[in-house]
Amino acid sequence: MKKAILLSIVLAGTLFSVKPQSYPKAPGAIRLLTYNTHYCKGGYDPGEINESNVKKLAQVIKALDADVIALQELDSASQSRGIRYLLHEIAIHTGIEYTDVYANAARFDKKGSIGCGALVRKNLPIVSRIIAYLPGDEPRAAIQLELEKFVFIATHSDLNNEKRIQGTKIICNDSREMKKPVFVAGDLNDSFRWSRNSASFPLYQKDFIIASDTVGNTIPGRTNNGALIDFILLSKKGKNKIKIVDSKIVREINIEGKTIDLGEISDHYPVFTDIICK
């Protein structure tokens, strides 16, 4: 009887000591993040375009305390979506002071556009910025941001294999000219796991190492081996100047005491990598 009571106490203590999912940064670390927003429609199609969903995604970014962020599936000035500037709205709702940089890659809804974007915490000054436009059945872009210690490229690769290869070549060629370490972050629509259909990843692997978590998938609900397509890469020539501290594909997170399933927020999970510049 005493053993049973003792076991119950131990189990209860174990249950109550389990911490909600949180991801603290190491002191001095810079957190890089890539997140496909699904236009802030929620985790499913058709989803809903509303401010509530924008706030939910922004709260994930706030909880992760990210410093430099690549965001995909953004829209701007679309009449059917309230003529919103989605990247800026996300930034505002985080409550964090970010500089936002948007690449209007493709026309959408008459006078609107869709594209990718980047958010950079304002205590990390942007030295220079370049937007490179990439081939695609849906036109694509890569935002090249030079910071003090590294270059951050935010992109969203095309679904067309041949055009994805062309876009990857442009990014790789540009990165070779850069003296600082280079990160490429985004939904690459490609994977090192795709033995037959991997069109562009072998090109990246010539110049970059994978700097992000590769355990499991980045698309919620997918159990097949090919659903890991969101990455943060680091240039091989710059890896000696960067220490990778931590990286996670974030599937759930604690926000205000509640555990949030991030499959409800977007159809991609966010991926972060914490770095220290040497």
Where are these regions (language model features)?
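Active-site environment of divalent metal-dependent phosphoester hydrolases
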Residues: 39-43, 76-79, 108, 160-162, ...
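N-terminal, active-site-proximal structural segment of metallo-dependent hydrolase catalytic domains
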Residues: 2-5, 16-93, 107-109, 267, ...
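Structured beta-strand-rich core segments of catalytic domains in phosphoester-bond hydrolases
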Residues: 74-150, 245-249
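Surface-exposed cleft-lining segments at the edges of enzyme active sites
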Residues: 40-46, 130-132, 153-161
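Generic enzyme active-site microenvironment
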Residues: 34, 70-71, 154, 185, ...
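Active-site beta-loop-alpha substructure in enzyme catalytic cores
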Residues: 152, 157-175, 181-184, 188-191
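Metal-dependent phosphoester-hydrolase catalytic domains
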Residues: 130, 173-183, 190-278
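Active-site neighborhood of phospho(di)ester-bond hydrolases with catalytic His/Asp-centered motifs
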Residues: 70-72, 99-104, 183-187, 210-214
